[in-house]
């Protein structure tokens, strides 16, 4: 997550202190974004002082601000989108239904992005949860960036909401 809670949560998951998780779609995806694009993040400790012009500059440079942390769209979101789209299309063509976290589990456990990790994978709570196959409840998936990607791909006919 943008608050780097994954470091302590991953340790608790691996120590069998966590048996299920409920989180927002943003919490789910941000752990993976951080995993592959950490070095490209921008920290803005004085985020309350940003002017509308400052905000526009961040947007123009493809940074999505979450409080004091700016997530790089191209290095994080679009990279993960490509991997998820393949999984969504494959699931739709096979008539398979999955929960949002199951697509991330598949991505993480496949090793497809392992060479792109920019943080210690031991700090990823989602990877720890995938390794334990923990159930995750994700209300509000549609409000997340990847949830919006999924909706747009459905609207444009590239996949369907099986």
PLM segments and residue spans:
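Conserved catalytic alpha/beta core of Sir2/sirtuin-type deacylases, generalized to analogous enzyme cores
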Residues: 2-162
